[in-house]
């Protein structure tokens, strides 16, 4: 296990959480299995994260993502650029816990929901089980593949 690569990946993910600069810079791609058994990917803003261990995103309880998660809780998250590719595989759940939602709330979410107490605002919590990390840091290439 390459601790440097894991640490750097965690720093990259942290820099993406609550990103409001526009473009794809703050997004992660979440892959779920749809109702027909096919992969379905969505670009989402990371609300909160703990390194590569867990990430949270926002959704509504009646969204396609919430429906897919209720049928199959296996997921993958990919955060990539020209200098890194962080692919995480794990389990995911829809969470309606006020403390979790309060912790992950940030102001740009107000274009979709009225606040962390909005009944249509739910958290999606992804927990990593496996990872595949590639980071180019200057001339230093860091790679790590493993299980948490």
Which residues are covered by each model-predicted region?
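Charged, gly/pro-rich active-site loop segments
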Residues: 87-148
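ATP-grasp fold ATP-binding core
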Residues: 30, 69, 123
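Short solvent-exposed loop/turn micro-motifs enriched in small/polar/acidic residues
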Residues: 23, 39, 70, 85, ...
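A short, Trp-centered hydrophobic/proline-enriched beta-strand micro-motif
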Residues: 12-35, 75-77
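A short mixed-secondary-structure module that forms the rim of ligand-binding clefts
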Residues: 45-82
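Residue-level recognition of conserved beta-strand positions in structured domain cores
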Residues: 32, 59, 79-81, 90, ...
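N-terminal leader/targeting helix
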Residues: 25-53
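Short, low-complexity N-terminal intrinsically disordered segments enriched in polar/charged residues
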Residues: 1-7
């Amino acid at each position: 296990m390459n601790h440097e690569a894991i640490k750097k990946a965690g720093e990259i993910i942290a820099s993406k959480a609550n990103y409001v600069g526009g473009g794809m810079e703050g997004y992660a791609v979440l892959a779920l299995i749809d109702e027909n058994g096919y992969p379905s990917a969505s670009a989402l803003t990371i609300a909160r994260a703990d390194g590569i261990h867990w990430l949270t995103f926002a959704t509504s309880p009646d969204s396609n993502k919430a429906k897919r998660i209720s049928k199959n809780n296996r997921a993958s998250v990919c955060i990539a650029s020209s200098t890194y590719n962080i692919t995480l595989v794990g389990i995911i759940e829809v969470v309606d816990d006020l403390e979790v939602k309060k912790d992950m709330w940030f102001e740009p979410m107000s274009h979709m929901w009225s606040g962390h107490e909005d009944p249509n605002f739910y958290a999606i919590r992804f927990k990593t089980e496996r990872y595949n990390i590639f980071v180019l840091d200057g001339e230093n290439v860091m790679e790590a593949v493993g299980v948490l």
